Amino acid sequence: MNHRTVIDVFLNLYEPIGHKPMQGGFPNIKKLVSHIFGEQYELGMDYLQLLYLRPVQKLPILLLVSEERNTGKTTFLNFLKALFQDNVTFNTNEDFRSQFNSDWAGKLLIVVDEVLLSRREDSERLKNLSTTLSYKVEAKGKDRNEISFF
């Protein structure tokens, strides 16, 4: 990937990724993706490829749900963070409740581990974020700015 900090007259907030794809086997990644996606392994690999090659393409929301412990959910989220580096952020309910969101609103992936939706407003906020086309970003001491949100 050819990362550019400025595209035309716009600042590119996407962070460069420090590793490049290479030919060869990837048994550990294949095993993890196969474990998470099961029969939908090819879909999972396509999803990861699209995230890498077309980061601005709107993709479906992934939701990993299991009442069982030690199923690999957190391991998969950590893998996504290692793969996409600074373009991934881990959020908690408090992050979504804060009026200041500039640190996460422009990320490729916003991952949430062990979310507890005890308040109706939390689930409504997540529902809104997962379906909206644009979102207002706010940083401390700065005006709100509307961005495309995918």
For the regions a language model picked out, list residue spans one by one.
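P-loop NTPase catalytic core of nucleic-acid-dependent motor ATPases
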Residues: 2-111, 123-126
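Active-site-adjacent loop/helix micro-motif of nuclease/hydrolase catalytic cores
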Residues: 119-121
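Catalytic acidic motif of RecA-like/P-loop NTPases
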Residues: 116-117, 127
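Conserved catalytic/switch belt of AAA+ P-loop NTPases
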Residues: 123-145
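Conserved Walker B
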Residues: 114-116, 133
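AAA+/SF3 P-loop NTPase mechanochemical coupling elements
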Residues: 100-105, 138-150
